[in-house]
From Swiss-Prot:
Gene behind the chain: pepA
Molecular functions per Gene Ontology: manganese ion binding; metalloaminopeptidase activity
PROSITE patterns xref list: CYTOSOL_AP
Protein's name in the database: Probable cytosol aminopeptidase
EC nos: 3.4.11.1, 3.4.11.10
């Protein structure tokens, strides 16, 4: 389920390249396209610029042109990658470089080794180019037949990546190592989300996590259905009871001895969502294998934090269930007793993600972390409010803003949203403590309001510890790309928010 065959990533001088293709950047300046590299010999650069008009080069985002190698450049193929508009100083943004690297590498599938001479003269720029290249070198073929995989071998992702940079090895190597680790984490999420629900369900998801982390310092603890029942995880059990594949709760932990802080992460892991008795229309189920993207993200972030040896304790909680209709499934009007004791009236069985997440939020905050962030493909309302590329971020103001800032630094799109107090009234139940469904309008924020009720909900009343800061990331839109690939983002699973959360955790170490 999780592919371990990722591309290698090294820094090279131009004269030492072994690649068969070299990527250079072209931006859009006020007077036309601008070549963005100092690595090429002057004659080669002049010849390239002279070809722009003939080739129709504009330097637009995702624009890729190929042409034969030039004298003084030790590769047989040159690739011009558009980075889009430049700033007032004639520079491309880090995200533009990341996107250009990804688009170029993605277009070169079938090429064994690719070098990139995009601007990489600072650690931030080098990181952007390296990350984009790694993320662009992705394909999911694990469930094709051997024959089909062999036929597709000519278009397999790039296996070797070389980045041309003037930085010394002491400065470049740590940047490239981080890019490789974070890129691998993003691609691990893509692998899991792209896996068919016939193969990935709660038990196999838990097994895949345990197997992947077996040789790492990350500890893994799995609750099966018997342990969940014995310990009172009523929400996870209720959502999973309609399926012949029982639910799981997985706790993973990176616990360095010198931890500067403790961050808890909670991920929604509905391995397939039919809607349950409140059945979805057939067309709405077509992407519902991706409803576990939040749990996959949490797994990948903890994995990356451990691989990078970040001095922050990180606990990840993966709430795994399959939401199916059957004679044993929960019904609208059922009442669930949750972990921690709160009761929930089920008004709609298709509002199931918040129920499994609530159990996990209680468990996570019982451990008194310094902050808890949850990640979920939670609501269709997120797409209505923010579209398919922005993550909605809600919660306590300071942590919400910290998450949005981390997303901005990582080059991911996120938008902070309010949680008005009046939304709580729409979740009132006449028979239980709270309903799992509120009013139609503001559905993304109402779902987050439901989750907020379970932060610290399992603590005894005499526990006078400060309330745990909490933020909620709704990735329903950006977690799965149903449109054409762009930049470093492929079709289908994207791995969104891994880079954001790794950056946020690293920030806590500082």
């Amino acid at each position: 389920m999780i592919t371990l065959d990722r591309p290698t990533l090294t820094a090279r001088a131009l004269e030492d390249l072994t690649a068969s293709a070299l990527v250079v950047g072209v931006g859009t300046g006020p007077d036309g396209p601008v070549l963005l590299t100092d690595a090429l010999p002057a004659e080669a650069a002049t010849a390239l610029e002279a070809s722009f008009e003939l080739l129709g080069v504009r330097g637009a985002e995702d624009e890729v042109h190929r042409l034969p190698g030039l004298g003084g450049v030790p590769v047989p193929l040159l690739v011009l990658a558009g980075v889009g508009g430049l700033d007032d100083d004639g520079e491309a943004s880090d995200e533009s470089l990341r996107r250009a690297a990804g688009a170029a590498v993605r277009s070169l599938a079938g090429t064994d080794a690719v070098a990139l001479a995009l601007p990489a003269d600072t650690p931030a720029r080098l990181a952007a180019v390296a990350e984009g290249a790694v993320l662009g070198a992705y394909a999911f073929t694990a469930q094709k037949s051997e024959c089909a995989r062999a036929e597709a071998d000519s278009s397999r992702p790039v296996r070797e990546l070389e980045v041309v940079t003037p930085l010394a090895a002491a400065d470049a190597d740590p940047v490239l190592r981080r890019a490789a680790v974070v890129g691998d984490a993003v691609c691990a999420v893509r692998d899991l989300v792209n896996t068919a629900p016939s193969h990935l369900y709660p038990a196999t998801f838990a097994d895949a996590v345990a197997e992947d982390l077996a040789d790492s310092p990350v500890s893994v603890d799995v609750w099966d259905e018997d342990r969940l029942r014995a310990e009172g995880f009523g929400g996870i059990l209720a959502i999973g009871q309609g399926s012949s594949r029982p639910p799981r709760l997985v706790r993973i932990e990176h616990a360095p001895a010198d931890a500067a802080a403790h961050i808890a992460l909670v991920g929604k892991g509905i391995t397939f969502d039919t809607g349950g008795i409140s059945l979805k229309p057939a067309a709405s189920m077509m992407t519902m294998k991706s409803d576990m993207a939040g749990a996959a993200t949490v797994f990948a972030v903890v994995r990356a934090a451990a691989a990078l040896d970040v001095p922050v304790k990180v606990t990840g909680w993966l709430a795994l269930a399959e939401n199916m209709p059957s004679g044993t499934a929960i019904r609208p009007s059922d009442v669930i007793t949750m972990y921690g004791g709160k009761t929930v009236e089920v008004m709609n069985t298709d509002a199931e993600g918040r129920v499994v997440m609530a159990d996990a939020l209680v468990a996570a905050t019982n451990e008194h972390p310094d902050a808890v962030l949850d990640v979920a493909t939670l609501t269709g309302a997120q797409l209505v409010a923010l579209g398919v590329r922005h993550t909605g971020v809600m919660g306590d103001d300071a942590l919400r803003d910290e998450a949005v800032a981390a997303a901005d630094a990582a080059g991911e799109l996120a938008w902070g949203m309010p949680l008005p107090e009046q939304l709580r009234a729409s979740l009132t139940s006449r028979v239980a403590d709270i309903s799992n469904m509120g009013d139609r309008f503001g559905g993304m924020m109402t779902a987050a309001t439901f989750l907020r009720e379970f932060v610290d909900a399992g603590r005894p009343q005499d526990d006078d510890a400060a309330r745990t800061p909490w933020a909620h990331l709704d990735i329903a839109g950006p977690s799965f790309n149903e449109s054409a690939a762009y930049g470093y983002t492929p079709q289908d699973a994207t791995g969104v928010m891994v880079r954001t959360l790794v950056g946020l955790i690293e920030g806590r170490a500082r």
